[in-house]
Amino acid sequence: AYINLPGQPFDFQCPAGQVISRVSSVYDVLLEDRQWEFGCRTENVTQTCSTSGYANDFGLPLSYSCPGKKVLTGIRSYHDNQIEDRRFTFRCCDVMSKATTGCHVSEQVNQFNGPMLLEVSAGQAIKGAISQHDVAFEDRVWKFKLCK
């Protein structure tokens, strides 16, 4: 189920000991915003966590990586109706038992105004996110940094 209505803020956090393993989103053309849905799976993560400040300004590129051995466990965001864009903060927690190595950046997971789906393979976790805003489409395209 989507956790926000278009134009509304959201604050998603996986339960303790879990990481984000699925990111899904649809675009509402009328309200010029996305609805978001996240999935989590159990990984060996600790409660040593940190939350970023805002990783982007409205209309500007976003490029964020969780620090150290941390991986993505939560995302918070709010929308501006004048600029028709969102700002994002990220929550990251330490992974026990493995270093975040073998990282790569995914293919773009959506087109402007199109549906988005990222499903993270077993044994991988989301380390970060990269996104660009386009004024003509009033939307962002996304890639994610994935690590083993």
From Swiss-Prot:
GO biological process, one term: cell adhesion
Keywords, sorted A to Z: Cell adhesion, Disulfide bond, Extracellular matrix, Glycoprotein, Secreted
Glycosylation sites: N44
Signal peptide (UniProt feature, chain positions): none
Assigned protein family: Belongs to the dermatopontin family.
PANTHER family hit by this protein: DERMATOPONTIN-LIKE ISOFORM X1, DERMATOPONTIN-RELATED
Protein name, UniProt field: Dermatopontin
